């Protein structure tokens, strides 16, 4: 089924497995879905606890494994930064580069995020790596979690509500 415009789940099957190139890691999905809402993604994950949630894929590319289901969040509308009266709502799929160059966010936070991502690899990487993936991965070389903690950030999780970031 492929019907993204109505918010339905997209099911795509790959007829042949991806093979390793020059001995590098390969992540393979037996089945791939692209839900249109976070609720659909959550329900799919509840049905299959061995599923892999796919965001920017920067950290997942480091693994060499097969997953029964890949749940791609790119159709869920999580790639926006929204400003409310007293806060910024940052979607999990917002890239580090988007946040780094968001002028109103940078002004409101005295440029803390620009400083936090400055030493992360390069511009190309920051334009692909997501805020949600960075929070989930908690890489030791990344100051992103520290910056978000300093800003008293809370996360909103589908099915669990709003909560503070726990270091």
Question: Residue ranges of each PLM-predicted region?
Answer:
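C-terminal structural segment of proteins
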Residues: 2-5, 9-167
């Amino acid at each position: 089924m492929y019907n993204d415009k109505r918010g339905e789940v997209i099911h795509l099957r790959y007829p042949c497995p991806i093979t390793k190139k020059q001995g590098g890691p390969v992540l393979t999905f037996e089945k791939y879905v692209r839900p249109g809402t976070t609720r659909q993604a959550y329900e799919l994950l509840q049905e299959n606890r061995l599923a892999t949630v796919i965001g920017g894929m920067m950290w997942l590319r480091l693994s060499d494994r097969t997953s029964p289901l890949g749940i791609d969040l790119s159709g869920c509308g999580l790639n926006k930064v929204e400003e409310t009266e007293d806060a910024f709502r940052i979607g999990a799929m917002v890239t580090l580069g988007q946040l780094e160059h968001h002028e109103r966010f940078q002004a409101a936070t005295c440029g803390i995020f620009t400083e936090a991502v400055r030493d992360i690899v390069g511009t190309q990487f920051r334009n692909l790596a997501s805020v949600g993936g960075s929070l989930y991965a908690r890489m030791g070389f990344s100051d992103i979690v520290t910056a978000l903690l300093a800003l008293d950030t809370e996360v909103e999780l589908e099915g669990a509500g709003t909560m503070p970031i726990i270091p």
